[in-house]
Curated annotation (Swiss-Prot):
Keywords, sorted A to Z: Aminoacyl-tRNA synthetase, ATP-binding, Cytoplasm, Ligase, Nucleotide-binding, Protein biosynthesis
Function field: Catalyzes the attachment of proline to tRNA(Pro) in a two-step reaction: proline is first activated by ATP to form Pro-AMP and then transferred to the acceptor end of tRNA(Pro).
Oligomeric and partner information: Homodimer.
The protein's name: Proline--tRNA ligase
GO MF, one example: ATP binding
Broad enzyme group: ligase
Catalysis performed (reactions): tRNA(Pro) + L-proline + ATP = L-prolyl-tRNA(Pro) + AMP + diphosphate
Enzyme Commission no: 6.1.1.15
Length: 440
């Protein structure tokens, strides 16, 4: 993509309304624009990141055996009355009426709807286990939306719902999602720590939050320092191996980890002092097992092998991709801007023409741009008339992981400069060697 033809509205000044780093940088980097309180437009640059985040989530959900679908954003109030949750959300839920005065709502979550769908079609134990997920925009009318997309009223959510014949099967489904979440966050360059969590209005008796450590996090967290050294499950993990998944779950939950709501001071004090970590963190995922909380009132049952009816056991599993983008920035930035993990960077490589209008640098940039694009790299070529200093600032602000600096002085010696955003390291390299260096 040529920057001269791209829509990237960079802000040089820090917006006054932005209170935290991610909000400031997302506005300055032209990723989002606020349209009303807690509601944002995702501009092209931001959408590229959001799409990459969603693609990783999809790949890991699919790998675990979950099946993607899409449910409507507008739901019937009758479904929520049937579950008994219609009043639980209070004013957070946006209630509306259609032209026929039928009561509807803008869904804040989908337990009721997915249960109603499964109730209608799944009649036999042979159709279980089943895990359905979708990625959908949701709305919760926060009293005080703030911090940009970190705590907004409209947000993108991946929510999955598992259905099993009994508690043992449901626990296997829970462990599948537990492992899938560990892999998802690791692929995004994040160290997510699972912590026992309160179930809140979702309900149930088993729940874990996945927390990444960040100084600006909203939660106070306490954990064993060894979590930072633990390796995520490998790509060849067998999701059908119940015992194997349970061992992964046990390994990731045997050490102490809790948010302030579930903190046990005595248990924390029992950790060797050198291994105790008290920090702040950001929730990036939340999973729940709630048994028959929704299937019971909806009458979601299947006929078992024994010929008897069995109420389906359920779980739900959420990741907020839009919030996750903000969380990644909170966890990975410096004074100059965003430092994207490679897997979600909107562009992998930036080419900076340091002398616009010069035929030699222009030709070298064009050649590099063509070669890298043909090799499958997402490239942003800064071919604008801006001065070199402004181009450096933009490249660092938007977090281009690799930056190729092309100027007449270096080209005279047959070299360009390759900069790594994450650590600022630079090296002189022949243009023809760039591809091999990026692959190294």
């Amino acid at each position: 993509m040529r920057l001269s033809r791209y829509f990237l509205p960079i802000l040089r000044e820090v917006p006054k309304e932005a209170e935290i780093v991610s909000h400031r940088l997302m506005l300055r980097a032209g990723m989002i624009r606020q349209e009303s309180a807690g509601i944002y437009a995702w501009l092209p640059f931001g959408l590229r990141v959001l799409n990459k985040v969603c693609n990783i989530i999809r790949e890991e959900q699919n790998r675990s055996g979950a099946i993607e679908m899409l449910m409507p954003t507008i739901q019937s109030a009758d479904l929520w009355r049937e579950s008994g949750r219609y009043d639980d959300y209070g004013k957070e839920m946006l209630r509306i009426k259609d032209r026929h005065e039928r009561e509807m709502l803008f869904g804040p979550t989908n337990e009721e709807m997915i249960t109603e769908i499964v109730r209608a079609y799944v009649k036999s134990y042979k159709a279980l286990p089943l895990n359905l997920y979708h990625i959908q925009w949701k709305f919760r009318d926060e009293v005080r939306p703030r911090f940009g997309v970190y705590r907004s009223r409209e947000f993108l959510m991946k929510d999955a719902y598992s259905f099993d014949l009994d508690a043992a099967g449901a626990r296997h489904s829970y462990n599948k999602m537990f492992v899938a979440y560990l892999r998802t966050f690791a692929r995004m360059g994040l160290k997510a720590i699972p912590m026992v969590a309160d179930t809140g209005p979702i309900g149930g008796n088993l729940s874990h939050e996945f927390i990444i450590l960040a100084s600006t996090g909203e939660s106070e967290v306490f954990c064993h320092g060894d979590y930072l050294e633990m390796a995520p499950p490998s790509a060849d993990v067998n999701f059908d191996d119940a015992a194997g998944l349970q061992s992964v779950f046990d390994r990731w939950t045997e050490l102490y980890a809790a948010t302030s709501e579930k903190h046990d001071e005595a248990a924390f004090a029992a950790i060797p002092e050198a291994s105790r970590m008290a920090a702040r963190g950001i929730e990036v995922g939340h999973i729940f097992y709630f048994g028959t909380k929704y299937s019971e009132p909806f009458g979601a049952k299947v006929l078992g092998a024994d010929g008897a009816e069995h109420t389906i056991h359920m779980g739900s599993y959420g990741i907020g991709p839009s919030r996750l983008v903000a969380a990644m920035i909170e966890a990975s930035h410096d004074d100059n801007g965003i430092i994207w993990p490679d897997a979600v960077a909107p562009f992998q490589v930036g080419i900076l023409n340091l002398k616009a209008g010069d035929s030699t640098t222009g030709a070298a940039c064009e050649k590099l741009y063509a070669e890298l694009t043909a090799a499958g790299y997402d490239v942003l070529y800064d071919d604008t008339e801006e001065r070199a200093g402004a181009k450096f600032a933009t490249a660092d602000l938007i977090g281009l992981p690799w930056q190729i600096l092309v100027g007449p002085k270096g080209l005279a010696d047959g070299k360009v400069e390759l900069k790594r955003r994450v650590d600022g390291s630079r090296e002189l390299i022949a243009p023809g060697d760039i591809l091999e260096r990026l692959k190294a």
